[in-house]
């Protein structure tokens, strides 16, 4: 019997790579994408293969909606199946600053990747799953604590993630009668290349009590949630939101 296949976007490093390792450990072969191809791709492939997975990289820009059908077809051609989709690729605000100064170009870029691209790629995957009927399908969206927390210096990022959260809920309702669960994982402050530039800021805020757990999150924390949700042990759950944030989103006085 062939292993189930997971397609993970934005997985050559960071959270996506950690998710790939976790799903490889759980018995999946890994199809992974990113917008760039560099030494990190080979490193990621080695990590996935070390867990017994077949791994294949597909260079892909999630914002290029016209290329989505080709990507999914290429994954099917390479592996013969597609069982799980993890929408992880995303970008931050190109320039942080006053939201009254956000340009149309900056706003559109973030929306094209984080919302529009992610939504339409999940649409393509869902269509294929409805035809193929994999035994244990699932779709997971990696969003952000910024679905609930406002950052006025990167408002377009917050809007994009909140929009994707609503898309995940709508897709969960649409696919529930078809037996395809849809989940959302909301990372909090996670140690990645994207957050490296603001590490000093959040080191100080964490020390001041911003996060009840008292530490940064790691990519492996997010990956553990994705692996659990897609394990097949939550057969009556869909539309579920899991916060992986050390308690950041808990309202406190």
Name each model feature, range by range.
Residues 26-43:
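Conserved glycine-rich Rossmann-like NAD(P)H-binding loop of the short-chain dehydrogenase/reductase
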Residues 96-99, 103-108, 207:
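Substrate-binding pocket helix/loop in short-chain dehydrogenase/reductase
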């Amino acid at each position: 019997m062939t292993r189930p296949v997971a397609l993970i976007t934005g997985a050559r490093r960071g959270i996506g790579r950690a998710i790939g390792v976790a799903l490889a450990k759980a018995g999946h072969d890994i199809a992974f994408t990113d917008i760039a191809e560099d030494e990190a791709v080979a490193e990621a492939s080695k990590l996935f293969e070390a867990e017994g997975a077949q791994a294949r990289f597909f260079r892909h820009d999630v914002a290029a909606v016209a290329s989505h059908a080709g990507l999914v077809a290429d994954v099917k051609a390479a592996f013969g199946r597609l069982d799980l989709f993890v929408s992880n690729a995303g970008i931050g605000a190109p320039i942080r600053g006053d939201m009254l100064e956000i340009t149309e170009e900056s706003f559109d870029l973030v929306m094209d990747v984080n919302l529009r691209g992610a939504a339409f790629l999940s649409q393509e995957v869902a269509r294929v799953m409805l035809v193929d009927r994999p035994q244990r399908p699932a779709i997971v969206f990696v969003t952000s604590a910024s679905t609930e927390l406002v950052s006025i210096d990167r408002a377009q990022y917050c809007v994009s993630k909140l929009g994707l959260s609503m898309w995940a809920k709508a897709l969960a309702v649409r696919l529930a009668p078809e037996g395809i669960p849809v989940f959302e994982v909301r990372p909090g402050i996670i140690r990645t290349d994207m957050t490296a530039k603001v590490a000093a800021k959040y080191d100080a805020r964490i020390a001041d009590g911003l996060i009840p757990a008292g530490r940064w999150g790691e990519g492996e924390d997010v990956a553990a949630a994705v692996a659990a949700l897609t394990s097949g042990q939550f057969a009556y759950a869909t539309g579920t939101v899991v916060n992986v944030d050390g308690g950041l989103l808990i309202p406190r006085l």
